[in-house]
Each structure stands twice: as C-alpha cells, then as structure tokens.
C-alpha cells in the first residue's frame, strides 16, 4: 500500500488524484492533504479519506476548518510550515505535488529531501529550479514521476530505449481556445474566452497558460530537466485533437507516441501505480471514431509566450524563474480584468529584458529571484505591490 500526501488536494489535479485513490482503497491511504481556499471541498475530502494531517493557507482558515469539523479531527496546520509538514510526514511514501505555480517549489523539494517519491504535477518546480531539484533527486535516490500528460507520454515512449538513441522529444499542444483567432481578435479576448478550453478541464491559471501557449513553454523547460535533453532537441507540434499526448523520435527515424482520450486520471493513475497499470476510469480510445489527427507548427507571432519560454531556456540560470514569476503576476492581472490578453506576453518580455541572468546555487536564491520577478512584473503592469 502507498501512503500519500497530496499537495493541492482541492485543485483540478488533486481532485482527480483522489478519484483514482477512491477507486483503489486497498492500494492507497491518504496521510495528509493541503489546500488553498476551498475549505468546503477540503472538509468533504477529510470526511471521506480521513487524513492524519491537513494544512491550509492561513491561521484563520485553519480555525474555520477546525470549527466546521465534527468527530475526530486531523491535525490542522497552516502556511509554508504546514505544507512542509505534510510533504515530509513520516508515514508518507509518495507525495503528489499538485500545487499551482512557484508556491509548490518549497514543499516539493522538502519532500524530495525527506526521501519521498514524488508524482510531479507542479511544472514550475523544475522550471524555476530544475538543476537543483534534479541534483536532489539523484542525491536522495528518489523517483520523480511526471503527471503532466505530455511528460507522462514522453516517459512511456522512452521506456525500454537507450537515452543515446533519442533524436528529439516532440511535445503536442492543443492550441487552446484561440487556435484559429487572429491577432486583432486576440487583442479583445476576454477571460471567459480564455477559460473555454476545447479539450481539457483544468484550473483557471493553467487554462490561461494554455491559451497563451506559455503552458507549453513551461513544459519544454520541464522536459529539459526531467529527461536530461537539450532544449534545442525539444519541439512543439500543434495537435488540436489532443489524442497523441507527445512523441519521442529516435536516431533511426522511428517515432514512439502515447495516445489516449484526454483525461488527467490516466497519467495520474500511471504515476501512482508505476510500473503497473490499473483501470483508471478513462474512456477507451476508439481510433475508428476519429475523423483524423492533424499536426502543424505553432505560430509564435500570435502566441509569443512560447518563444519567450525558449528564450528563457536558452539563457538558463535565473531567467526561467523570472519568466515564470512574471507570467504568474500577468495571468493574475488578466484574470482580475486589469490587463488584456496580449498584454500577458508583453509584460513577461519587458521583465525578461530588465533581467540579467545569474547562477542560482540554492532554493533560497531561487525564491529571491522569484520575488524580484514578481515585484518587477507588478511595476511593469502598474498593478501595485
């Protein structure tokens, strides 16, 4: 039996993870949960899965949660201290890292340093601190299983093959809700437009990232660290049907791909049960029911965020962390109605132009760089600190 901590249990990935866990009570036990603002859902999760420890954002939320619970209560903590306690709980054997954004970095690295295997859905951990995180993974001899559908597909497509035989990795992207929109249309895109993803059901921030194609840019950087492959050998193909989740091309011209119905429970179940497989509740793929599979190159003129991510990856050092911080602030401003859709990438580029990349030797240096990126993005956007 695997004892799980789920960081971000009330988010999209956290909820899907608990759906998988509920289907296999003999395989999984929930030790700890962390959540942000959705106390009502967290209360339901506590009553269903009976964790020993839960953590929320603030002391006030912890008190409110405690008052709402009846009967035997779990230990309730809050803040970064609570997230770290959940990530490093002694009984936990695997941590599902599903917190959105750079906020997931500290508890995820704490889990690794405590010797926990990690099912990684928080791509920002590797985007901001990839070299440090992978060094920790090697030192602690833990397993890092990708939960992103694209990286899970690459992981499966590499199975049984030698790394020296890999020519390149090809990440697929749906193109998001604005696949066929022109630049003029994009200038007037609303929050509701951006959140209307054609294939995937995700949280608000990642759905906007998908609309700008920054999500794919973050995944390029994540793949660079996960699979130890130069970013120049990681390509992106637009694939509107989201059936092929990613591909690996080998030196002999062969291409291995992983296909499936778009449903995050598939990669989650794979990460939780590797090297085995279990029925995940994902609808079986019927290729005969498809009218066709199409692929084409991304348009970085309409979607400059992808180009910015490649620029950050090429610059290396602190630049990806700055880019990510600027993106989080810009997306937050867009969702709040303070800036337009195209202003997201414009703000990120301005912040990157102001930054001189430097080496990052510790997680604290990564966090300081993240803080600089956020402050600078707020100044660029004029949204205050």
UniProtKB/Swiss-Prot annotation:
Its cofactor is Mg(2+); Mn(2+). It comes from the Bacteria. Pathway: Isoprenoid biosynthesis; isopentenyl diphosphate biosynthesis via DXP pathway; isopentenyl diphosphate from 1-deoxy-D-xylulose 5-phosphate: step 1/6. One of its GO terms (molecular function) is manganese ion binding. Its EC number is 1.1.1.267. The keyword NADP applies. It is an enzyme of class 1 (oxidoreductase). 1-deoxy-D-xylulose 5-phosphate binds at residues 123, 149-150, 174, 197, 210, 215-216, 219. Pfam families: DXP_redisom_C, DXP_reductoisom, DXPR_C. GO terms for biological process: isopentenyl diphosphate biosynthetic process, methylerythritol 4-phosphate pathway involved in terpenoid biosynthetic process. The keyword Oxidoreductase applies. InterPro entries: DXP_reductoisomerase, DXP_reductoisomerase_C, DXP_reductoisomerase_N, DXPR_C, DXPR_C_sf, NAD(P)-bd_dom_sf. NADPH binds at residues 10-13, 36, 38, 122, 124, 203. Mn(2+) binds at residues 148, 150, 219. It catalyses: 2-C-methyl-D-erythritol 4-phosphate + NADP(+) = 1-deoxy-D-xylulose 5-phosphate + NADPH + H(+). Keywords: Isoprene biosynthesis, Manganese, Metal-binding, NADP, Oxidoreductase. NCBIfam families: Dxr, PRK12464.1. Belongs to the DXR family. Catalyzes the NADPH-dependent rearrangement and reduction of 1-deoxy-D-xylulose-5-phosphate (DXP) to 2-C-methyl-D-erythritol 4-phosphate (MEP). HAMAP family: DXP_reductoisom. This is 1-deoxy-D-xylulose 5-phosphate reductoisomerase. It comes from Geobacter sp. (strain M21). The gene is dxr.
